[in-house]
Structures are given as C-alpha cells and as structure tokens.
Amino acid sequence: MLEKAEKQRRAGSGQQRAAGYMPGFGNDFETESLPGALPQGQNSPQKCNYGLYAEQLSGSPFTAPRGTNERSWLYRIRPSVRHTGRFRRVDYPHWKTAPHVGEHSLALGQLRWSPLPAPSEALDFLQGIRTMTTAGDALTQAGMAAHAYAFNADMVDDYFFNADGELLIVPETGAIQVFTELGRMDVEPSEICLIPRGMMFKVTRLGEEKVWRGYICENYGAKFTLPDRGPIGANCLANPRDFKTPVAAYEDKETPCRVQVKWCGSFHMVEIGHSPLDVVAWHGNYAPYKYDLKTFSPVGAILFDHPDPSIFTVLTAPSGEEGTANVDFVIFPPRWLVAEHTFRPPWYHRNIMSEFMGLIYGRYDAKEEGFVPGGMSLHNMMLAHGPDFSGFEKASNGELKPVKLDNTMAFMFETRFPQQLTTFAAELDTLQDDYMDCWSGLERKFDGTPGIK
C-alpha cells in the first residue's frame, strides 16, 4: 500500500531522487540525484555543474572538536537566501517553548492521558502539534519539549524549519513521508526519524488512515548521539549500521509556497514562488536519519534483579555534566524475562530525572491497563511511580519461568529538568483523573513478624 501511494505521489511531481538510504550513524555521506552534480576534490568550485549553488549548512561551531563538528555542503538550484524574504508573524497557539509554565489549576501529581482525539477539521502536521510539557530554556539551548501530534492533511506547498532545536518524531498511527532538504524518509510506526536543527522539511501522509498520530521530542540542547556502551562492549543496543540517512532528492516546482520558521519560540512565515527543497547533491555529516526500533538489541539481567532502565537508551543528548543527559530517548521493546527469585517489572522508583512516556503498540509490562497505544504519562522529578496493583500482584505471585514479553513498544523522553505542564495538557479531555487509583490496592503487608507475606 505504501509503495502504491509513493508511486502516485511521485508521478508528475517534479521530484527526483535515487533509490534507497545510506546506512550508518554520524558518517560523512555523499550523494547526488543527478550524475556529476557533486563536486569532487573541493567544496566550493568557482562554478558548479548544472548551474547549482554551493552552500554550507553548519550544525556546530566551526571550531568544535572533530568528533562533534557537523556540517554538510549542499548543491542546490537556488541559495537559501532566495527561500526567505520579509517574514511576518504567524501563530501556532498549541506549540509552546520553554521556559513556559501553563496557566492552569491542575495539582502536582503523576499524570496519564488517553490518546489525542482525531481532529474534527483538516489539519496538517504543523497544525496538529500539541505541546504537553516543556523543560529548560530554548534560548540557552538547554532542555526539551514533549509534543503529541494528530493530523489528517498533507503539507503540499508549506515548508518548515526549526531554529530552536532538532525534532525526534515517533509515529504511533499512520506512516508518514518526511521530505527534507537532504532527501526523503518514509517512516512507519515502530520507526523514528530525526530532523536536524535548521533543516527545511515537509510532512505528508502515507497509507490509508483516519488519523496520523504520534509523538515528538524537541531537543533544544546538544544533538542526539549514541550512548556509550561501557562494559557492554562493542555490540548491542542501537547499532550504527541500522540508522538510515536518505539519498539526495529534490523538488523542482515553480508555484506559490510558504516557508515557516520557529525561532526563539515564535513562528514566522514568508511566501516564495518555488519549492525550497531544491538540493540536487550534498555531502557531509549534518543530516537527517531514520531508525527501526525493532532492530534495537536489548540487554538485561540473565540471573536475578532488574537493571536500571538506562540499558534501553537508544539516543542521548548530553548536557555539560558528565553522565547526566539533557534528554534521553529510551524504549522498552520485546525481550525475554528470565530472572530468578526476582520481581521482574520495573521497580518502584523516585528519580532525579523527569519522565514523559508514550506507547507505540501493545502493552507496557508495568501498566497493563489504562496505558494504551497513543497514550501518555508524566512522572516528574522525585514523584513516586511504579507498577500498578494488578501488575504487582501478577509479578509477585506468578511462576518464574522464562517469559517472552512480546508485542510491546513503549518509550520515554527523560530529562534532567522538571517538565512543566502546558495548559492544553492540563485541560485535555483525555486526562485520566483516576490514574493514581491504579496504586490504591497496594496495602500494608507488614505486621512485624518474619516471613514472606
């Protein structure tokens, strides 16, 4: 179905690209959609082939260490200065930026929501974004925002880039095509994609759904990278070869288009007469990518006890403090549970980090009821959380034979900063007022006498 939709979209669209993706994480890639469009041996020829313009897109300061220095050279039909003009302010009232504290009366506590409802009117990807929490300060490039999205229309002649941070998109319902300056990515539920800070893109729908829904982590800080494996060694977790960067693709059309920008928390728009997705060739290491979460190779306890959830980290955005993330992206994928004489679900916990969770499909082992695909939960710093009553009883009394935890994919955006709730999130109809009742059955068992109770 996706292949058919893709062919229909490409027919007569003026879009050009080679087939496929390039594997690897942080590689220095090179790709061209027309033969000879990519200069060899230098970055900025006096005149580029095909009459293209050479332009550098920098994702780090020029003097950043080699290991964190990011830039790509783009060879495009027009330079980006032609994709701008006199901007005017526009409003996306449901997209908030840190620092932001919503004006609401909702008391502090552990929170959970059912999925966003399907939109009752036509909304494209940008119009469908709803900020749930913000953390840190975008102006100092620290922190993040957690968004949910639900949309039902394509960005046809609308284009967008975010100067405030990179966007990690996690589809839950409905596959999407993310067409960036550097190429196109088809992203299905159970896959993620990342769009670097400042990179132009648009989002269209793939397949046939009533709603396209998912989650976004807007990372204001240092870019996401792979976590160090430490004693785990050279393999497992997210392997670099499973990350896919798109090959060059461009859109050559002369039609009224709108370029929209998020800059320091405000939104701006300019009208131009052509598509800005006009990069015919490029090389460099500042690039978008997608990743299939099903290729994550989990590690865990193979004798007793439950390890820390950091072993499930897919990507981490470091802060200035060693071992402390600005934001981590963590998943809880299918895996075998084999620990002996052990309470196998995640333990009860209070944490210096703040956790925003979502469920892509299946059930989450610590919350088998109430936490459904498309739903969300928020456990802020130092607020207690853990398995619900039924999960505790099941895990405490079940036979400890090897069990495969299958058909599940939950995730977490975890940050060192407290996550401030937006007014939208506090007043959302899908907020579960009875969430904390899930622990009400956890009664006192202690009676002062020895023995298992």
UniProtKB/Swiss-Prot annotation:
Catalytic residues as annotated in Swiss-Prot or TrEMBL: 306
Keywords assigned: Dioxygenase, Iron, Metal-binding, Oxidoreductase, Phenylalanine catabolism, Tyrosine catabolism
Region described as Disordered: spans on this chain: 1-42
Enzymatic reactions: homogentisate + O2 = 4-maleylacetoacetate + H(+)
Binding-site list for homogentisate: 364, 385
GO biological process: L-phenylalanine catabolic process; tyrosine catabolic process
Binding site for Fe cation: 349, 355, 385
EC number(s) from the headed UniProt entry: 1.13.11.5
UniProt similarity note: Belongs to the homogentisate dioxygenase family.
Xref: PANTHER family: HOMOGENTISATE 1,2-DIOXYGENASE (PTHR11056:SF0)
Protein purpose: Involved in the catabolism of homogentisate (2,5-dihydroxyphenylacetate or 2,5-OH-PhAc), a central intermediate in the degradation of phenylalanine and tyrosine. Catalyzes the oxidative ring cleavage of the aromatic ring of homogentisate to yield maleylacetoacetate.
Name by which UniProt lists this protein: Homogentisate 1,2-dioxygenase
Organism, as annotated: Rhizobium meliloti (strain 1021)
